[in-house]
Amino acid sequence: MRIILIGSPGSGKGTQAKIMSKKYNLPHISCGDILRKQNKCCDINKLIKKGELINDKLVTNIVLEKLKNINLFKGFILDGFPRTLYQANSIKENKIKIDYVLELFLQEKYIYERVLGRIIDKVSGEIYHLKFNPPKFITEKSNKNKILVRRLDDKKSALQKRINDFFKNSCLISEFYKKESLEKKLKYKIINADFDINTISNKIFNIINV
């Protein structure tokens, strides 16, 4: 089972991808995590801080290289890729079969609240939200050691740029996968992400388990 999760910043892609990864025993490939790990090797860090999209060809090559190192027949969950039409076409041109494309749709007015309240455990990679999904405990020690941190691109100054880029590209990607779905090449579904984590998970499971 090969699944793509796309959606705006704060729509819950990473959270849902991790839940699905555990449930279906599939590797979770996060485009964002891959790029953040690359920033020591190249100049990606500066672009991430500004909320700017990385060069299409560079991102595509990095993600495709990652996909080469896993069992494509067993499947995977690809989170946050493709973000542009070029990237979507690259998956198709490289003959990587996709079974499901799930788009988590979140209205722009909710994106700010979701993203600006997001914190991440630097050690485990677990994603929390100060309002909607707070960690069970936050000690002075954990704050001092900066175990709970904000992502570089979650700063308000970078967020608007990310939102603009997303909506500029999302229509093209949606149309691309609608066409693929009509041609029975995959299943493309839009899921309202303005719900709690468990409700969204159940919506996803209902689609996949049909």
Swiss-Prot record:
CDD domains recorded:
ADK (cd01428)
Please give the Pfam families that the UniProt record associates with this protein.
ADK
Q: List GO terms (cellular component aspect).
A: cytoplasm
Positions of the region LID?
A: 117-154
Q: Which GO terms describe its biological process?
A: AMP salvage
Q: Which SUPFAM superfamilies match?
A: P-loop containing nucleoside triphosphate hydrolases (SSF52540)
Write out the residues that bind AMP: 36, 52-54, 80-83, 87, 151, 162
Where does it live in the cell? Cytoplasm
The catalytic activity of this protein is classed by the Enzyme Commission as: 2.7.4.3
Q: What class of enzyme is it?
A: transferase
- Which keywords accompany this UniProt record? ATP-binding, Cytoplasm, Kinase, Nucleotide biosynthesis, Nucleotide-binding, Transferase
- The record lists ATP as bound by 10-15, 118, 127-128, 195
Which family does the UniProt entry place this protein in?
Answer: Belongs to the adenylate kinase family.
Comment, domains:
Consists of three domains, a large central CORE domain and two small peripheral domains, NMPbind and LID, which undergo movements during catalysis. The LID domain closes over the site of phosphoryl transfer upon ATP binding. Assembling and dissambling the active center during each catalytic cycle provides an effective means to prevent ATP hydrolysis.
Subunit info? Monomer.
* Annotated protein name in UniProt: Adenylate kinase
